[in-house]
Amino acid sequence: MQIALAPMEGLVDDILRDALTKVGGIDWCVTEFIRVSERLMPAHYFYKYASEFHNGAKTDAGTPLRLQLLGSDPVCLAENAAFACELGAPVLDLNFGCPAKTVNRSRGGAILLKEPELLHTIVSQVRRAVPKDIPVTAKMRLGYENTDGALDCARALADGGAAQIVVHARTKVDGYKPPAHWEWIARIQEVVKVPVVANGEIWTVEDWRRCREICGARDIMIGRGLVARPDLARQIAAAQKGEEVVPMTWAELQPMLRTFWQACLVKMTLVQAPGRLKQWLVLLTKSYPEATLMFNTLRRETDCDRITVLLGCSTKS
């Protein structure tokens, strides 16, 4: 079994990837989507989203990073994919699942699930453009308005050359509302010969067990569940081995938060950093009651020095 950290725009950036992969249990992670259209993007654009390329395409914990592209122009995607490989991408992932309205209006993400033929063209052209030893993978939802074309889309991706398909078991219209329709993952696996990875609504070890029972998927991808419970992958890995599951305590999480905050101060402006910390705290409230107290304490705080003191960070250089 492999457990992947999902790509989430504006949330799972290199700072949070570094924090979460250090906890353990995550086998690979993916960049936020890198939007490409009409032209070959410069190297610094890729490094912005994948700073791990400077570290052999791995986080400091040694977790491999995949690079995800988003767009609808097969030629442009293929050219940028080839360049990304030159920069160090070990795996190329294609985004056909983003539900954001602004992205869909620009013919990116889940809107392309209405066009299985285009999915096939994109994957096949990217596959031809990158070295044979670099896998091309894809992430999809079950459809746009409904699941009518789910199987056709999966076939198109596999036939185009996708080596693996991550299935977020909801439609675009479903957004992130529960439930995730895990039974569809099993149906998709029946019609394609490549591995299918289950994604959606895995917040606990028990969710993982139910997902596995329903869809039979060997591998899983977790997004918000891992952000809300940073040791979830480690818990699942332990459960899968029959070992005792010992959840991370709030006290054990504190050093992570402090390190994360210090990294935000280094990589972001003093205006951006407080919002980034609060964004993570909001999701942590789903697993830790103490996070609610901390969030309420910091909610209106914008002074970074004050936040540093409230977090108990050392002010020494």
Swiss-Prot record:
**Residue numbers binding FMN:** P7, M8, E9, Q68, K139, N199, G200, E201, G223, R224
Q: Which residues form the active site?
A: C98
| Gene3D superfamilies in alphabetical order | Aldolase class I (3.20.20.70), Dihydrouridine synthase, C-terminal recognition domain (1.20.225.30)
Catalysed transformations (reactions): 5,6-dihydrouridine(16) in tRNA + NADP(+) = uridine(16) in tRNA + NADPH + H(+); 5,6-dihydrouridine(16) in tRNA + NAD(+) = uridine(16) in tRNA + NADH + H(+)
Q: Which family does it belong to?
A: Belongs to the Dus family. DusC subfamily.
* Reported cofactor(s): FMN
Q: Which organism is it from?
A: Pseudomonas syringae pv. tomato (strain ATCC BAA-871 / DC3000)
What is the recorded name of this protein?
tRNA-dihydrouridine(16) synthase
Keyword Transferase among record annotations: no
EC class, as a word, reads: oxidoreductase
Site (Interacts with tRNA) at R35, N95, Y176, R276, K278, R299
Keywords, A to Z, come to: Flavoprotein, FMN, NADP, Oxidoreductase, RNA-binding, tRNA processing, tRNA-binding
**Which purpose does this protein serve, as stated in its record?**
Catalyzes the synthesis of 5,6-dihydrouridine (D), a modified base found in the D-loop of most tRNAs, via the reduction of the C5-C6 double bond in target uridines. Specifically modifies U16 in tRNAs.
Task: Give the gene that encodes this protein.
Answer: dusC
MF-aspect GO terms: flavin adenine dinucleotide binding; FMN binding; tRNA binding; tRNA-dihydrouridine16 synthase activity
Is Cell cycle among this UniProt entry's keywords? no
What InterPro entries would the database entry show?
A: Aldolase_TIM, DUS-like_FMN-bd, DUS_fam, DusC, DusC_C, tRNA_hU_synthase_CS
**Pfam families to which the protein is assigned, alphabetical:** Dus (PF01207)
State the EC number(s): 1.3.1.-
